[in-house]
Amino acid sequence: MEGNTFDEMAKQYDTPEQIELSEIIGKQIKQELPDSRSKDVLEYGGGTGLVGLQLTDMVRSVKLVDSSRQMLDMAQEKISRRSLSNAEVQYADFTKETPELEADIIIMSLVLHHIHDTASILRELFHVLRPGGRLLIVDFDKDDTFDQHEHNHKILSHDELKEILSEAGYSSIHIQTFYHGKSVFMNQDASLFLACSVKE
């Protein structure tokens, strides 16, 4: 979520490989959203909207929040081009200030491993969720063969994430691996998990 880095990446972000992976992620998230037409979705680290904008026909609204203005510019272009009346973007950097936001469902897709203070961000998102709201996190499974530190990534094990979520106030935590892909993370094979949790 470091703005400058992702500002530089914005125009080259929507590669065929990234689009394909986002469609796989979107399909998995959609399975978690039955009967959600009255729900407001916030995607934290929404980027160019590859995942969040797949959900606009299933929910009341989608708000893409990101700390990269260039990424959000790309997302806004898609929203305008597709005439999506229930989608919008908002610039925000939760590491500096949490904006006044509310949502029934919060999505984080391939964002968690970029966050250094995971516990702090998950606590902030807990306050954004309405009572009964759900947090859906998709990210890479921890693999000791990854050279995380070289690229400044922080990948958590399922147990580590469960503990952080629980301490932040979330309950009904369920984490499951759903996809194994070739060369999907730093040109290495990797698997993806979906973590679901609830704010009671």
Which residues fall in each region the model found?
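Conserved class I S-adenosyl-L-methionine
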Residues: 1-36, 74
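C-terminal lobe and adjacent flexible extensions of AdoMet/dcAdoMet transferase-like proteins
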Residues: 195-200
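Short catalytic micro-motifs in class I SAM-dependent methyltransferases
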Residues: 110-111
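A conserved beta-strand element that flanks and buttresses the S-adenosyl-L-methionine
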Residues: 107
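A short glycine-rich, Lys/Arg-flanked "PGG" loop and its adjoining helix->strand segment in the class I
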Residues: 120-131
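C-terminal alpha-helical "lid/dimerization" subdomain adjacent to the S-adenosyl-L-methionine
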Residues: 5, 14-20, 134-194
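Class I SAM-dependent methyltransferase SAM/SAH-binding core
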Residues: 44-96
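Residues at the starts of beta-strands that form the adenosine-phosphate
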Residues: 40, 60-61, 86, 134, ...
